[in-house]
Amino acid sequence: MTSVEWPGRMQRLAYGRLVDLAPDGSELWVDGGHNPGAGVVVAEALAEQEERFPRPLFLICGMISTKDQTNYFRAFDGMARHVFTVPVNSSEAGVPNEELAARAAEAGLSAEPVNSVADALMLLADTWEDTETPPRILICGSLYLVGEVLAENGTPPA
């Protein structure tokens, strides 16, 4: 077992409905890691990518209330240009997007609540300068959110 792939763990989205909403040339990734340790591992993986091919990093994050949101976000301090927080609609324990934005801000990140992943992608696309390197976008914070994203994108796990 030298190579194992887990759907929803640093999974690249190369095509689909949500990918089409992002700024042209964007890299979209999903990761369902939802605790501070997972945040560190994902941040390290993104730092390696950044060394090879630099791109501005944006997070689109939704989390549930049983997780340590602030310390999850701390792993991305100094890396993420901005965080869009979204509701997790498939769990009753989803943290309201406004509250999650406050947790990201506590961790030192620029953050704003939006209503959906699609809204975040459209907002980013509408404000993106064509002269800038296309962004790397990580959709993260909850396996529930990853499931929603894969379904909405039209790329459910095999």
Where are these regions (language model features)?
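Surface-exposed, flexible loop/turn segments at secondary-structure boundaries
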Residues: 18, 65-67, 91, 119, ...
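Canonical bilayer-spanning transmembrane alpha-helix
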Residues: 136-140
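C-terminal helical cap/extension that packs against the catalytic core
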Residues: 25-30, 36, 73-135
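Glycine/aspartate-rich loop-and-adjacent alpha/beta segment that forms the canonical ThDP
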Residues: 142-158
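Active-site catalytic pocket residues across diverse enzymes, especially alpha/beta-hydrolases
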Residues: 46, 50, 104, 128, ...
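Short, flexible loop segments at boundaries between secondary-structure elements
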Residues: 8, 88-91, 158
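Nucleotide phosphate-binding/pyrophosphate-handling subdomain across enzymes
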Residues: 1-82
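Cofactor-binding loop segments of dinucleotide-utilizing enzymes, especially the Rossmann-like FAD-
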Residues: 61-65, 88, 141
